[in-house]
Amino acid sequence: VDKFVIQGPTPLNGTIPISGSKNAALPLMAAALLGDGPTTITNVPKLKDIYTFNNVIRVTGAQVDFDESDEELTINPDNIGHLEAPYDLVRKMRASFYMLGALVGKYGKAKVSLPGGCAWGPRPVDLHLGGMRAMGIDISLEEGYVYAQAPDAIGKASFTLEPSSVGATINLVLASVLQADKFVLHNAAKEPDVVLLCETLAEMGADIDGIGTNTLTIRGVDSLNSITVRNAPDRIETGTFMIAAAMHPDSEITLTGTDPSELGVFPEYFNKTGAACTIDGTDIHIKAPDEIRPVSIDTGVYPGFPTDLQAQWCTMMTQAAGESTVTDTIYDDRFSYVPELVRLGADIAVEQNSACVNGPVPLSSASVMSTDLRASVSLVLAAMVAKGTTDVLRIYHLDRGYEDLEQKLSSVGAHIERVDQNEDG
């Protein structure tokens, strides 16, 4: 088990290339199972979750080839014969549950384990299953598995997502594009990952109206073609590095190969901190402010403030001159990182789904432990401005979602080293 050893404080200067998005790639991989013949996805990051999903897909009999040097992933579903996603793989990552929509969507039946994934908060799959039942798909739960069986013909159906859910939207789109006569999904998520999935399926031959809106109307087609599609850049990685650049007054970095249009309201909030942010096509240039201004945020569905940048923002606010509040309206239980920041010297009080942050406080080194993917990166950000040497333990969470994190940060001046945790835990 590895840990990061980070020496701070250090300014960041230079250029960081943004990787492809894990959250956008996983639905595209599931969509590839719906086509006839091999579909190729480019700009795919080399991440643990991608490898896990490759293995989930291989269990079905599909052929998966990942050319890591070119970041190209080719999936050929033509030899699928095993309509199951087993517990030992699905438990590692909740997005494996997209196999339910993909398999029942193309083959009319599936057996998929209930998912695992990040440790925080309840993540019910009731919305996914409720939408499928609304389509007339027979759903049963036995011994930790979901069994799905589609009828010979799915007629007209509609379903309203309450609340809106990215995962459920993706699964229901996958399930309906080949099966449904007409399926209307109300209060659908319109995150960039959902839009890219729908646009990709449309290019494969699916009939989807309302892409990019909260109402999707899907008319089933007989078959889908295979295509080559480029995966989106990672907007959460983009936001994370923007925050990292703002936290040390001498930092100035350029992020390349991103898509600023997919960041929603985030740049607007970011500029309020006093940081200088210049957008030039697919590049973003950030210059840190001399003093960070406190800016309170409430997370929201896209284009609102992303819940996946909440922990990083809270960390930046420990260095802001004044009081701010970070409220997560998406998940109740996403502040498990706060006690670790407090160990570094942060002044943060959590009440229900809000954190009240007082700054600026000088952070100093300690050993801290990651609890989930975004929490772990917030501890890395804190360690880079903390005085002394900080150990960040359990960084396997980071390997699920950040490609080459220590190499990218080292290349712009961070003192960060991956070492074997050994007896440290």
Specify the residue positions occupied by each region the protein language model found.
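Short, structured segments at the rim of ligand-binding sites
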Residues: 1-425
